[in-house]
Each structure stands twice: as structure tokens, then as C-alpha cells.
């Protein structure tokens, strides 16, 4: 499997992504309004629990905007990981009847959640500006595209690995559920990296989600940029996991049609 397959079959990936997006909001009473409601409700919960009760502060910046963006990023990561893990099993009938690169299904799962994420980012930016925040042009130009790229890569590797694993081992879905519960607490979703003791902070950035969150928050709600060393660590781990996922997927895909 070669990386150029992603570009060669971009139209098929787009078709799968649009189909999944339509299914998500089909017959929903509030429709796409859920894209705004979910991060707002999540941010309210985080604000009450962490800012109100645990006294987590963001050095004069809007904690609500900080939490809203964190919840939006987390929602993208968790829902994409869950849907991507099941993408091959969900499309089992197509896999056995239609000849197309199997990598299309998990790749398409990376896209629908970006719509909800864009809404959360817009809301966080507006609220941050309204509360007197606002990032520099450099943070915006660098942090936004690099942060989004790191986020997508951070979830793409696990999606490829786990989607291939679920075909053969159906209890892989239970691993995803447990893993996400653990990851939520060890990721700076509702708290800033400074909340973690300095001696342990380097371990925080072994998690690529921490690097992506740091870049996106610096770009949109004007939090300090993480150090180059921290971002390099997160980026390196994300790329390594991506290639491990690609390798595992390539070795497993010949058995997909036979097992499903």
C-alpha cells in the first residue's frame, strides 16, 4: 500500500465521507445544530468541574473558550477513532463484492468529524475574542494548519491499526472504549499543560493529542505555544504510529474478504 493511494482515490474517499456525514444527521430533530450544541454543553460541564470546583485557571484568558476548543478536539478524536475502527466491519458487504482499496474506508472516517470540529473552533475563537483574547498572526498561520495536520495524523495511525485488527479480533472495540476513557484524563483537554508537574510534563507530549491541542489553542484562544521540543516529540510519535498503522494494515488487508 502506498501513500499516493489516498490522492488517487480521493473521490471515493469523499463519497464515503459524505455518506457517513449524511447518516450522522439523518432524521435528527436539531440536525447540524448538534455540531454547536455538543461542544457548548461539554464546555459548560468542564467549566463547572475544572474551573469552578477544581480552580483550574488559564492566566487571564477565557477558560470557557479554552474548554470549548478542547472538547471539540476531543470529540473529533474520539468519534473518529470509534467510527474508523469499525469502518471495515461496517462496510463488510462492499469489501466482499466490490474491488477498491481497503484503505479507503478508514481514511474516509477521518473527514466527517472535521465539520463538527470547525464549528467548535469557530465558537471558541468568537468567545475568546469577545472576552478580550486574540492570537497573533504568527500563531494563527503556523498553529492552525500544523495543529490540524498533527491531529489528523494522530488519529489516522490508530484508526488504520485498529480497523485492521477489528476484522480478525472483534474485541478490539472494547480496547478502544477503555483506551479513550484513559486517554481523556491523561490529555490536556480540560486543563492546561502547566497543571502537570514540570518533571512529568515531557510525558504529556508523548501523546500527540497534547501537541495538537497546544497548537490549536495557541492559534485560536491565545494560549502560549508549546516548546519546539514538546511539539517535535508529539509530531514524531504521531508519525511513527501512523507508519506502524499503515504497515499493520498492509499486512492484514489480504485476509479481510476471507474473514469478513
Where is each model-derived feature located?
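Hydrophobic transmembrane alpha-helices and immediately adjacent juxtamembrane helices
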Residues: 1-260
